[in-house]
């Protein structure tokens, strides 16, 4: 059995990444969402074990000491991280796994797993990003300004380090682009070696 593929999706906060990721998981079979660990509090209808594993700072820092993360980062005073064992369990079963992580975490994963496929979600403009952050009503004005400043000074330029860039100005088009990337990556020759060899045997080859 061929190992599954690791996909990374990153974006400035408010670019629509989480909504696209949820839609992609529903559209594409054998694609598993990687549930990250975080020290932040749940928002809205979020549940532990579904959107995130919500843990306290002491638990998270102990996991760091024990090298249990394939990546982790501190963003706006909260930790976020991907557990190594969760990722390995999925890809060993031949399934693909999708990591919804920030640009710092993505850089760590690329160093440890050079064959990952990375996707950057770009907002259509600064003004649209600001409006989306305000409309979702999850942050106070000060936090929104911090997020916009971070996007403008740091995050938006990280697109250069990604394999694919999707501009999320139309949700349906962005969704179809993400789906197409995953399906195309599954058709790469190296990913299909086992199936190809099985077919060749039916033609009398070895």
Task: Indicate residue ranges for each PLM-predicted region.
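Walker A/P-loop
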Residues: 18
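Post-Walker A helix-loop "phosphate-sensing" segment adjacent to the P-loop in P-loop NTPases
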Residues: 25-34
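Small-molecule kinase domains that catalyze NTP-dependent phosphoryl transfer to phosphate-bearing small molecules
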Residues: 138-206
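Extreme N-terminal, non-catalytic leader segments
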Residues: 1-6, 29
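ATP-dependent small-molecule kinase phosphotransfer cores
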Residues: 38-97, 104-107
